[in-house]
């Protein structure tokens, strides 16, 4: 059994500058899991792919609360089954890639380290079929949705919800891979493309009604049991995503919006989340999806006080989660056995 080494990646120049998570840390950086240990030996592990605007504010928020922080580059993480647990009080999972985000949370939970978000929450949010099933089962309003397990069955699925419709990848973010299909020719083209893709996962068809909106959607940022802020995302394209050039403006956080966002967050397991809502032209308010890797620079709408308030709420939730502890604490079980 090997020990986890002391990886202090990003606790110095790399973290403050935001240019990388291992800057100036020496040869040991990235060798294995580890932490820059604070005075009490129990730092908050801020696990990230890179230090962006949001991570810098989170670092400041944790430190204002007297917490030692170890910034860990998720690209350097490795561990051996049976290793002792890293000396982390709690982990704040800010991994960019969905696959790494899920494995980071699973790793922390296996070691008995409280982590936000949980692997259960990440697994639900990062699979659009799973999340829509969960939201619908919780009684939340969602767009009319159909699923087909192969492209060959996709035409029937789309026929059931009607056109126009939107075909989405099961996994993905930032508005990538969405296809609006207006007629049967477009349907046949998209399904043929899906059939040609190499991965069986890419053959799954996840389709939703095209919800006609005032060319905008709503993002509600949630921290635990608190809806922190809400914004309208308005763009020139039907995909209302900041990564696609949408503009954000303040949205009044009405009791209806707050209730819907908190119910959606609770349904997927809670944590630090971005709940995306659609206002349809016919008066419906629908839960489109819930994001487990929420970015909040856009939600701050250029206002420093709002950005700080979001970071403070996130830090409070993570530290509260640390105080509650994590279920199933203990080392990752080894395959080694005393039995012959």
Regions found by a protein language model. Give the residues of each.
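A short, polar/charged loop-to-alpha-helix boundary motif
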Residues: 237-244, 296-305
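Protein kinase-like catalytic core scaffold
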Residues: 165, 206, 228-229, 273, ...
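Phosphate-binding site of ATP-dependent enzymes
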Residues: 179-268
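A short beta-strand motif that forms the metal-chelation/ATP-contact edge
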Residues: 89-90, 220-222, 283-298
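ATP-binding N-terminal substructure of ATP-dependent carboxylate-amine bond-forming enzymes
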Residues: 1-121, 149
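Active-site nucleotide/adenylate-binding loops and adjacent lid/helix of ATP-dependent enzymes
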Residues: 2-4, 39-41, 48, 84, ...
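A long amphipathic alpha-helix within ATP-dependent nucleotide-binding catalytic cores
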Residues: 239-287, 308-327, 334-340
